[in-house]
A protein has these predicted regions:
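Nucleotide-activated sugar donor-binding and catalytic core shared by glycosyltransferases
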Residues: 1-34, 38-54, 159-183, 187-193, ...
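Generic beta-sheet signal
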Residues: 34, 57, 113, 131-136, ...
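Conserved nucleotide-sugar phosphate-binding/catalytic loop shared by glycosyltransferases and other
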Residues: 37-81
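Short gly/pro/ser/thr-enriched loop/turn and capping motifs at secondary-structure boundaries
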Residues: 40-42, 61-65, 137-143, 147, ...
């Protein structure tokens, strides 16, 4: 099976696609990856080590993360993400679409990362079976369950999804509508489902133990599990300084804002460091703004480390609510404090609080005093810790990448057996399984 994968975004958006490509390779399939990194990260060394064919489109995004941070300063989550799209996605739609058509020409199945609707457009133009990777199951409409930003009352489901559809259309529909119309492709009615979902297969890269599917979802939606990087993909060992720090006292709290630190360069690192001091707890602060390890009393500043390796050595995690970091903390059995920037991160934060494994506070309302107090609460709570440990136990045997590969194999086989047939499309309000 030849699989073409296209992704746009930051490290949190693209690493799972690399992980999927790696699993496809290890399963005996061919995987070609096209990426548009908005944070300037070079994926060539990692992909070379994993034997993955990689193309970066364009060769270099003509705006730096520093410029993005200067331009995208809004504390309004919708305005923030639309500004990032205007700076880093919209200018490259045509070359991304050309690359997507090339992927379709040499693939049996194509897979698009979140927001990467250029590949859906190309798949429609070339009639190539198409799947989408999504990191937020909470945006799949249901007649029974409302969107995660609302209370879980069934009567809110229909008006809640109607409201979310309107908000998504207002924020994100204009560019794909113009593009699809210009290419003579089917009309975009609504962002959900026409832009963000596939009629063939949608792989929601989340733990089914943590975020189970609604009972009325269509079979085209699969909560497959986290797409985790192979443990041997990125060799890492504790430095002597970090080992000494860990051995000198109780387990620290791990703090990281991931790639979102780029957006708030003036504030992000300062908030984490000040919050660590205000908490009175030992802490490891991971940052992209330092190239060297630095110790400041009971706080250790770390440039990079694989979260999955580091988190088990800590007592709790403070993060921004990305899908990957949320799973990292849960798999390690550690309670978390989430500081979300945008809606999808807030959905993860609320889901975590609802399951009893963490607390959350909007990043835009965070102060060192409030974050420090919540850190102490999370670390001292036996109930939060025990719930996080139970979640870790329930997730231990989940194999998201393996499930995703098997679903893609089924999609490819169905296409080969009946190349002119089209799978039943997903309805906007959640089609029942047959």
């Amino acid at each position: 099976m030849r699989v073409g994968i296209q992704g746009w975004g930051s490290e949190g958006d693209l690493r799972p696609l690399v992980a999927l490509a790696a699993r496809l390779r290890r399963s005996g399939h061919s995987a070609s990856l096209v990426v548009t990194p908005v944070d300037g990260k070079d994926y060539r060394p990692l992909c070379d080590a994993l034997g993955i064919s990689l193309t970066t489109v364009p060769d270099r995004v003509e705006i730096t993360v520093q410029q993005i941070a200067q331009e995208a300063k809004s504390a309004n989550p919708t305005k923030l993400i639309t500004k990032v799209l205007a700076l880093t996605f919209d200018p490259y739609v045509e070359p991304m679409y050309d690359a997507a058509r090339d992927l379709c020409a040499r693939s049996d199945v194509v897979v698009a990362g979140p927001s990467c609707w250029t590949l859906k457009a190309a798949s429609l133009a070339t009639r190539t079976p198409h799947a989408i990777i999504d990191y937020v199951p909470g945006v799949v409409p249901s007649r029974l369950i409302p969107p995660d930003f609302l209370p879980p009352w069934r009567w809110l489901a229909r008006p809640g999804w109607a409201l979310l559809s309107v908000l998504m259309d207002m924020a994100f529909a204009a560019t794909p509508r113009r593009f699809f119309a210009a290419k003579g492709l089917p009309r975009i009615r609504h962002v959900i489902p026409d832009v963000v979902f596939s009629d063939h297969l949608n792989l929601h890269a989340a733990s089914p133990s943590f975020w189970p599917p609604a009972p009325d979802w269509a079979e085209t939606h699969c909560v497959c599990g986290e797409l985790a990087m192979p443990d041997d993909a990125e060799p890492w060992a504790l430095s002597s300084a970090l080992r000494s720090f860990l051995n000198e006292g109780p387990p620290p709290v791990l703090l990281s804002l991931g790639s979102w630190e780029h957006i708030v360069q003036d504030r992000g690192l300062d908030l984490l460091l000040a919050s660590a001091r205000a908490s009175g707890l030992r802490a490891i602060v991971q940052t992209k703004r330092s190239d060297v390890e630095v110790r400041q009393g009971e706080t250790f500043i770390l440039p990079w480390a694989p979260h999955r390796r580091l988190a088990p050595m800590c007592c709790a995690v403070v993060h921004h609510g990305g899908a990957g970091t949320t799973h990292m903390a849960l798999r390690a059995g550690k309670p978390a404090l989430v500081l979300p920037f945008i809606l999808e991160q807030r959905m993860w934060a609320k889901r975590l609080a609802r399951c009893g494994a963490g607390r959350w506070l909007s990043f835009w309302k965070a102060t060192p005093e409030r974050v420090g107090a919540l850190m102490r609460e999370v670390v001292s709570s036996v109930a939060l810790r025990e719930r996080a440990e139970r979640m870790a136990s329930s997730m231990v045997n989940e194999d998201g990448a393996g499930v995703a590969v098997r679903r893609l194999e089924v999609l490819a086989a169905a296409s080969t057996a009946s190349p002119d047939s089209k799978p039943r499309p997903t309805t906007s309000m959640g089609e029942r399984r047959s």
